[in-house]
Amino acid sequence: MARIGKKPIQVPDKVKVSYTDRCITVSSDKGVLSRTVQGDVDLEIKEDHIHVVAGSENRKVLALQGLYRSLVNNMVQGVSTGFSRSLEINGIGYRVELNGQTVVLNIGYSHPINFELPDGVTAKVEKNVLTLASIDKELLGQTAASIRKLRPPEPYKGRGIKYTDEHIQRKAGKTK
């Protein structure tokens, strides 16, 4: 049943993991991430592996086991290699600039939009591609989704902000 939850998490050499008072902390030279473990789920740390253990065979507990295994794995991956997400800005006159921790978007509105990046997320701009990077996968995904929400891609001309790996289903316009 819980195939993902039973898999051990490999911990690289440069990553330090500690688990006290139901709070797991994962750290390396890139940064520190911590999370509180709730429910009937516990963690066992052995040398270079982390095991997520379910307290019972209840369906909800097994679901939580898989959830926490994925969350802890994302924490370990984040502090060791990091995550990045790229957004592509398409449209005539659409531009993106970076001023410190503020992303300035000119995306067809009468005014430029200033989007303040949260702590822990860095940005890089190349032509019409905005690349966000972070050690926290959850925060990175939420930030990218918030920026995309400002001007989602439209299906007729493809204008808007989209993920670089996203495919927009195009529609034909009206015919006379």
Curated annotation (Swiss-Prot):
- Sorted alphabetically, which InterPro entries does this protein's record hold? Ribosomal_uL6-like (IPR000702), Ribosomal_uL6-like_a/b-dom_sf (IPR036789), Ribosomal_uL6_a/b-dom (IPR020040), Ribosomal_uL6_bac-type (IPR019906)
A GO CC annotation recorded here is: cytosolic large ribosomal subunit
The subunit structure is: Part of the 50S ribosomal subunit.
Bias-annotated ranges (Basic and acidic residues): 151-169
Its recorded name reads Large ribosomal subunit protein uL6
A molecular function GO annotation: rRNA binding
Keywords from the named record: Ribonucleoprotein, Ribosomal protein, RNA-binding, rRNA-binding
Which species is listed as the source?
A: Desulfosudis oleivorans (strain DSM 6200 / JCM 39069 / Hxd3)
One annotated GO biological process: cytoplasmic translation
Q: Where is this region: Disordered?
A: 151-176
Q: What is stated as this protein's family in its record?
A: Belongs to the universal ribosomal protein uL6 family.
